[in-house]
Each structure stands twice: as structure tokens, then as C-alpha cells.
A protein has these predicted regions:
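Polar, enzyme-active/binding microenvironments
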Residues: 1-260
């Protein structure tokens, strides 16, 4: 219902939901939804507990989480089929800021990585059906900022990011890593992007993970993909209509929610 960037998105196999973001001149608390099978504009769903950009989204078939609300450690949730305002779910633990984080999920577990803290490599997780705080899952394969993620029901893929020893974004990375969602542990090398970049928009179905746009540091329009079950480098998929970054993405079968 509004133009914004740094929105948190997720959904079920019928609805996509999007919360927060920055429409300018200030952050938003609006939650919108779309029906994935039907083209059309987003419709108002409700509101987050506070306005904020850089909110991360994850979901099961019935419940959607918004992590890092108002750039804090707050986690909100909604029931996807029931319009209304978000309710408190718990907190992001381990002293992590919620700002500029990224999330993904299987049908049962959500995964969260804080993309703001310099030197952070900690991955957090929780159970979508059970309210409460996150717990430590493991470490990413390097201390990167703005490293996004997507998943099927088995594996989560992390891609890109940048190293920021001096606060600049000059050291863009081309790393792709993965974790097995059901088993806590550190991320393992998967392959490489064709272009080193950060702020990538990512989504997946059971087979394929898409990685679109990003900054290198200029904004890009490329779309790449990997086959989630097979480690290897990203391959060309196509192009966005315009160069984009800092958006969000979902699908009707992300996180293993569908059978594609």
C-alpha cells in the first residue's frame, strides 16, 4: 500500500506478507499482504508493534514472524490468514542488534542473522510454533554485513555481504554458504556469486534459490540461481526490469511450504 525499502517479507503458499520498511521521510509500521496467485496491489493487513525499517521476515504455513522490529531485538508475529496487528513473539538473543538483519525458515524453524554488527558471524534460530527468544545456531563462514539468506525445508543459503573494517562498503564479497536447518552448526562453503555484492533480494522453492539485484557498490539488475541440493557457483537466470537492492522477496513455496 506504500512504496518502501528495507521491508520484511515472508508468507504462506497463498499469501505474501510484508511489514515495516522506510517509505520516507520516516519508518513505517504497516503490514501489507498480497494473494500470490492473483496479480494486483497489496492490501492493508495491520500494524507492527513499532515502526522500523530493516525488519527481517520468516514464516511457516500459518504464522509469519518479523524480526528486528524498530531496529531493536523485538520479534513480532501474525497469523497469516487473520488480518490484524502483530503480537509480541520474543526477542533476538545473544546481544544482537535487530537492525539490518536477515531471516529465512523451514516449515518449523526460523533462522536469523544480524547484518549490522561489525565482526558478527553469529546465526540464531527458533521454533516458529513456540513463542520465545532465539538461541545460538552456529557461525557464518566469515564476518560479513548485509548478507542475505533463503531456504527450502532442508538447507538455508547465505549469499554476498561486505567486510567493513573502516565503515566503508568497498570490500564486497562473492561467498555463498549453507547450513542444514535441522542441525545446529557452522555454515559451510557452497560456491560463489558471479559478481561480489551485498543487499541481495533472495527467495527459494524446494529446488532453486534465486538471488536478485544487490549493490557492488553500484545497484545491479542481475538475477542468479543455485540448485540448493548441489553445491556450486551461481548461474545466470535473467534480469530485473530495473536495478534494485534492499528489497524483499517471497514465493508460494519458500522454505519448503510448497511442492515445487
Amino acid at each position: 500500500t506504500r512504496s518502501a525499502f528495507q521491508v520484511g517479507g515472508s508468507g504462506s503458499n497463498t499469501r505474501g506478507v510484508f511489514g515495516g520498511g522506510d517509505p520516507g521521510p520516516s519508518s513505517s509500521d504497516v503490514i501489507d499482504y498480497i494473494t500470490l496467485a492473483s496479480n494486483g496491489d497489496a492490501i492493508d493487513f495491520g500494524n507492527l508493534s513499532a515502526a522500523g525499517r530493516c525488519t527481517a521476515g520468516a514464516s511457516s504455513q500459518t504464522r509469519a514472524l518479523f524480526l528486528g522490529v524498530n531496529a531493536q531485538n523485538v520479534i513480532d508475529f501474525i497469523e497469516i490468514q487473520t488480518l490484524g496487528n502483530a503480537v509480541d513473539f520474543g526477542d533476538i538473543d545473544n546481544g544482537q542488534s535487530g537492525s539490518k538483519g536477515y531471516a529465512t525458515s523451514s516449515p518449523t524453524r526460523y533462522i536469523y542473522y544480524s547484518g549490522l554488527t561489525i565482526g558478527n558471524s553469529n546465526i540464531q534460530f527458533g521454533t516458529i510454533a513456540s513463542k520465545g527468544n532465539t538461541a545460538t545456531f552456529g557461525e557464518t563462514n566469515g564476518q560479513f554485513r548485509r548478507k542475505n539468506c533463503a531456504s527450502n525445508s532442508i538447507r538455508a543459503i547465505f549469499a554476498g555481504g561486505y567486510v567493513s573494517p573502516d565503515g566503508s562498503e568497498s570490500l564486497q564479497k562473492d561467498n555463498i554458504d549453507f547450513i542444514t536447518i535441522a542441525s545446529e552448526g557452522n555454515a559451510v562453503d557452497f560456491g560463489k556469486l558471479s559478481v561480489a555484492r551485498s543487499r541481495i533480494d533472495m527467495t527459494a522453492n524446494q529446488r532453486t534459490c534465486l538471488m536478485a539485484g544487490g549493490q557492488s557498490p553500484t545497484t545491479l539488475n542481475i538475477i542468479e540461481f543455485v540448485t540448493i541440493a548441489t553445491a556450486g557457483n551461481a548461474q545466470d537466470f535473467g534480469d530485473l526490469t530495473i536495478a534494485r537492492s534492499q528489497g524483499t522477496a517471497t514465493s508460494d513455496s519458500h522454505g519448503g511450504l510448497g511442492g515445487y
